[in-house]
Amino acid sequence: MDLQTKLEQLFQQNNDTIKKVKSLDELNQIRVQLLGKKGPITGVLRGMKDLSAEERPKVGAFANKIRDDLSAVIEARKAQLEQAVINAKLASETVDVTLPGDPVEAGTPHIITQIMDDLEGFFMGMGYQVLTGPEVEEDHYNFEMMNIPKDHPARDMQETFYITNELLMRSQTSPMQARTMEKHDFTKGPLKMISPGVVYRRDDDDATHSHQFHQMEGLVIDKHITMADLKGTLLAMCQHVFGKDRTIRLRPSYFPFTEPSVEVDVSCFRCGGKGCPVCKYTGWIEVLGAGMVHPNVLRAANIDADVYGGFAFGLGPDRFAMLKYGIDDIRSFYTDDLRFLTQFSQEG
């Protein structure tokens, strides 16, 4: 029997065997036996040394074809067996897609985060940038550029966590305003920004004070900015947060970085201004401080105070949340009590 006939018989015999294999392990054994170094095809190729020079290329090419054909049959059977394994597994693990799913309990943003996100969205809608800065700040930006030099008595108003003589934990988010004013190109338009974040002061923690709390400060610098612009902005913001029927009033106050300075009260949203314990029977609730940017603050940032002016305001998201939801202890925000926090689950 010549080698070519022997190869044809080898293919026919094993083709049928391969198609009847029932497992991947058995198929792998056949593959090794047929196509391995000790397999019959390799044996045929070794016997080619006894062939003539004319027969050798023909038999070699035919042997390679038989090996490729057997490999193809093995791969086809392998794919069938693998699919059969998958089908069997799917059949044993059938899921009824018509059954209701098990709901996963969803978390929700912290109430302070919700308040801050809402305020940021409001001011972004009015064209403000949202800019954040470092919590470890330079004394220069935290105080001096805010018209509070080292010997200024107003420094006694803020007990500060100092790290070194020139580094501190920021006591307000105003430093980001100073940094931005230094770099802003007013030839490209006005500066409108808010700077939200965490601030630190050496307060004793109690129901209304915390050594760490949140603040959001706003700043607008341009030509021809007036107190009317400030009042309109704050009225819109208070109505957005506390209700469209709210009104505000401005009371004279003092802040080193604004002149004139005002405290902003909103008409009580509990009693409608009639008087109640929330507003201490005055009909008004103090919500934030504001004012027109002091010329010294503009000059410190190399802005011409004779050409440009602006307003600034600072509010506490913690206080806003306490007022809006009737919370009487600021420490509740930081105790991680889920019974308290889940009351403010965000919808959507």
Curated annotation (Swiss-Prot):
Keyword terms of this UniProt record: Aminoacyl-tRNA synthetase, ATP-binding, Cytoplasm, Ligase, Magnesium, Metal-binding, Nucleotide-binding, Protein biosynthesis
Subcellular location(s) per record: Cytoplasm
Principal place of residence: cytoplasm
GO molecular function: ATP binding; catalytic activity, acting on a protein; magnesium ion binding; phenylalanine-tRNA ligase activity; transferase activity; tRNA binding
InterPro entries: aa-tRNA-synth_II, aa-tRNA-synth_II/BPL/LPL, Phe-tRNA-synth_IIc_asu, Phe-tRNA_ligase_II_N, Phe_tRNA_ligase_alpha1_bac, Phenylalanyl-tRNA_Synthase, tRNA-bd_arm
Top-level class of the enzyme under EC nomenclature: ligase
Residues where Mg(2+) binds: E259
Signal sequence annotation: none
A GO CC annotation given for this chain: cytoplasm
Entry's cofactor comment: Binds 2 magnesium ions per tetramer.
EC numbers, comma separated: 6.1.1.20
Catalysed conversion reaction: tRNA(Phe) + L-phenylalanine + ATP = L-phenylalanyl-tRNA(Phe) + AMP + diphosphate + H(+)
Cofactor(s) this protein requires: Mg(2+)
Complex and partners: Tetramer of two alpha and two beta subunits.
PANTHER family linked: PHENYLALANINE--TRNA LIGASE, MITOCHONDRIAL, PHENYLALANYL-TRNA SYNTHETASE
Protein name: Phenylalanine--tRNA ligase alpha subunit
Species name: Lacticaseibacillus paracasei (strain ATCC 334 / BCRC 17002 / CCUG 31169 / CIP 107868 / KCTC 3260 / NRRL B-441) (Lactobacillus paracasei)
